[in-house]
Amino acid sequence: GVQTCALPIFQDIRYAGANNFTGRPIAGYDAAECVVKREVGVRLKAVQQELARQRLSLKMFDCYRPARAVADMVAWSRNGKETAAERRYNPAFSKADLFRLGYIATHSGHSTGAAVDLTLVDLGADNSRKFDPAKDYADCTAPAAARAPEGSVDMGTGYDCSDVKAHTAASSVTPAQRRWRSTLVAAMARQGFANYSKEWWHFSLPGAGGAAYDFPIVRAR
């Protein structure tokens, strides 16, 4: 079944708050909890244990995503309004193009509990910069010091960046950023996870999918 991810892993469940491309909490995210299928959780724990030996940690941005949340994102993309804060996430084109270009889908693997969005944290680095909703950050493709802080290694773009620079094999990132991406992809692949080529942060466990769920995410007891 699908269960809360009770693992010693950093979590910043972005759709439960305002620090995401809509600027508000998404429908169905009643708590900032990572919920995954049991097999996914077991394998994430193994990835985390391997990374710990390198003084690294995973950080979860999204796990199970209720079907109602996907519908909310679809409606948002079609409402015809776009703020500067929203545009940070898709600087090269309008949010109306997100579907056509494959950045938002009407059905998400996240709704099966078998997909996760995550990044790496360097445990030896200063990760103290916090997101300030009142600050006017540069877009998600800008240098790390100028874009919204995420308390993680520099992957070359921010999370949920709808841009070719966020494609995992993008040639426009630096060698150091490419190494971080490779470290994450390799660690996840060793436990059977497959990366989505347009998003360095998105991984799924092949064969663990199935039916989409729509129960809301609530605080773990």
Predicted features by range, described:
Residues V36-Q54, S128-N195:
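Long, well-ordered alpha-helical scaffolding segments within enzyme catalytic domains
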Residues F10-E33, D163-T168:
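Acidic/histidine-rich, surface-exposed loop or edge segments in extracytoplasmic proteins
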Residues A18, V121-A125, D160:
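Solvent-exposed coil/turn segments that connect beta secondary-structure elements
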Residues S77-A115, T119, L123-A125, A145, ...:
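Acidic, His- and aromatic-enriched active-site or binding-groove loops in soluble protein domains
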Residues D30-R68, W76-S77:
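Active-site acidic/histidine clusters and adjacent loop/turn architecture
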Residues F10, R55-S57, G113-D117, E150-S152, ...:
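Extracellular structured ligand-interaction cores
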Residues G1-L7:
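Short, small-residue-biased leader/transition segments that mark boundaries at the very start
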Residues A186-R221:
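Low-complexity, Gly/Ser/Thr/Pro-rich intrinsically disordered linker/tail segments
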